[in-house]
């Protein structure tokens, strides 16, 4: 990339919590800035006051930090281009709106919401795409003046609309999609740049902020393509150069084949949801970066530092990115297996406490028992909340045996193995992994039964499961009393 000052931004609205798609936007801007040794700016676009939620901004900031991102400027890191909340920049926008009105490039519009809705319905009934029709079209200056005076007398507050140039093409070379162009007649007519409450709309504020903050590149979601020609018009009207744009592909839900929608509750879509399940931030980050960007080679597991080093915006995909929850689980499992024991212990223990399986502030002996239990299942866990399901046997006893498992117990070898094991267990001095394994080997020697025919009846009889972690370790943690109780119950059932 040619030498230039690189400044990019992530600019969320505090109308909700950090979504997977927004996290991806933040990450791609972050990687671009860090790869080219530029600046990454966090800006809060809170102009839609009615939709902002109380902890929206805090959620965005907390979850971005949890993912491992930091920024050079933002609400919590003031710089020379601040303020970094749009609600605090109203004094910057107003003179520019006044300028456009004075130059005849924007004007006051007094159409009410009811009139606009009626206009749209009429257009739909006529088979037209809804668009704003100039309310002053065909009026003489005197008639226009009277119309405005009547609206003011009725107490109607105006919006400010930008006057869309006619017969003009707006085009740009998109860093992801290639060349894109729009005809000015296709964007829906003159559009609002200032709302009735005096706040600027998104399309106006974002242009002013990006220009004032000297943003060089804008990477954002595909859904912003239609906003770009409107923004290019405003840049042109104010005599400013536009930044370079890159619009990232849609994210598709692999389960439905449809665009990922915040209203689709069939799939978890917010970073906080994954945090609460015990996903690791570096795994989430790894997965999100692969949504629409591909590294060179076959490997898919990289650290953030490695992603920064290898990042190339030319490898951003034009095709929709597939959100595959199973792939996310696989990636997180790779990180869980490689993670420090204490880190997984802390996360999984918290899951057990929150589920009411272990009391708060457990005694040291209980903590040590839980550590062994968690380590037993560590390699199986895709995320640490699974520990609650995986360890059900150790807290609530075994589940009902399914038909396939019952078939394993219906063989001629099952009952002799279980009876021999009961005797061996009864004679053990200490019920630990070493002695349990020795007892099972003694059963093998006594009965001549080995392999699957030896191990499977024991596992099913005591755990009611056909699969699980190492059996001797599992039985030690289950304890002598419960292991013998389950074993004897099965012997009685089969006898």
From Swiss-Prot:
Q: Where in the cell is it found?
A: Cytoplasm
Q: What is its EC number?
A: 6.1.1.17
Q: Enumerate the catalysed reactions.
A: tRNA(Glu) + L-glutamate + ATP = L-glutamyl-tRNA(Glu) + AMP + diphosphate
Q: Does the keyword Nucleotide-binding apply?
A: yes
Q: Where is this motif: 'KMSKS' region?
A: 259-263
Which positions make up the signal peptide? none
To which protein family does this belong? Belongs to the class-I aminoacyl-tRNA synthetase family. Glutamate--tRNA ligase type 1 subfamily.
Q: What is this protein called?
A: Glutamate--tRNA ligase
What is the species of this protein?
Pediococcus pentosaceus (strain ATCC 25745 / CCUG 21536 / LMG 10740 / 183-1w)
């Amino acid at each position: 990339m040619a030498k230039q000052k690189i400044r990019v931004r992530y600019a969320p609205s505090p109308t909700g919590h950090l979504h997977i798609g927004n996290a991806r936007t933040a990450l791609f801007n972050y990687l671009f800035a860090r790869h080219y040794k530029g600046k990454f700016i966090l800006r809060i676009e809170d102009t839609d006051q009615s939709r902002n939620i109380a902890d929206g901004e805090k959620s965005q900031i907390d979850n971005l930090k949890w993912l491992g991102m930091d920024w050079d400027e933002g609400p919590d890191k003031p710089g020379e281009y601040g303020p970094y909340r749009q609600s605090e920049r109203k004094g910057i926008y107003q003179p520019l709106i006044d300028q456009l009105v004075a130059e005849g490039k924007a004007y006051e519009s007094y159409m009410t919401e009811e009139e606009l809705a009626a206009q749209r319905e009429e257009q739909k009934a006529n088979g037209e795409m809804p668009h704003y029709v100039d309310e002053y079209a065909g009026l003489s200056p005197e008639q226009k003046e009277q119309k405005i005076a009547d609206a003011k007398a009725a107490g109607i507050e105006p919006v400010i609309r930008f006057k869309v140039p006619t017969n003009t093409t707006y085009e740009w070379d998109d860093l992801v999609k290639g060349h894109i162009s729009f005809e000015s007649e296709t964007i829906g007519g003159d559009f609002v740049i200032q709302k009735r409450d005096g706040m600027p709309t998104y399309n106006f504020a974002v242009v002013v902020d990006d220009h004032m903050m000297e943003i060089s590149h804008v990477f954002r979601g595909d859904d912003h393509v239609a906003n770009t020609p409107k923004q290019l018009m405003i840049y042109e009207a104010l005599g400013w150069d536009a930044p370079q744009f890159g619009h990232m592909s849609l994210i598709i839900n692999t389960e439905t084949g449809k665009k990922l929608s915040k209203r689709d509750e069939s799939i978890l879509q917010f970073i906080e949801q994954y945090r609460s399940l015990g996903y690791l931030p570096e795994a989430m980050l790894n997965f999100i970066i692969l949504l629409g960007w591909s590294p060179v080679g076959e490997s898919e597991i990289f650290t953030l530092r490695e992603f920064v080093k290898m990042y190339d915006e030319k490898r951003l995909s034009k095709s929709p990115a597939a959100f595959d929850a199973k792939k996310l689980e696989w990636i997180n499992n790779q990180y869980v297996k490689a993670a420090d024991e204490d880190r997984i212990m802390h996360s999984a223990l918290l899951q057990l406490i929150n589920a009411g399986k272990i009391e708060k502030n457990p005694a040291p002996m209980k903590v040590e028992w839980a550590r062994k239990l968690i380590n037993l299942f560590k390699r199986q866990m895709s995320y640490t909340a699974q520990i609650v399901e995986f360890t059900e046997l150790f807290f609530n006893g075994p589940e009902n045996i399914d038909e396939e498992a019952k078939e394993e117990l219906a063989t001629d070898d099952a009952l002799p193995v279980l009876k021999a094991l009961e005797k061996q267990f009864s004679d053990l001095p200490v019920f630990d992994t070493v002695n349990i394994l020795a007892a099972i080997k003694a059963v093998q020697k006594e009965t001549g039964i080995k392999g699957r025919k030896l191990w499977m009846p024991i596992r099913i009889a005591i755990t009611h499961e056909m699969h699980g972690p190492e059996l001797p370790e599992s039985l030690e943690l289950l304890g002598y009393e419960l292991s013998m109780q389950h074993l004897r119950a099965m012997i009685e059932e089969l006898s």
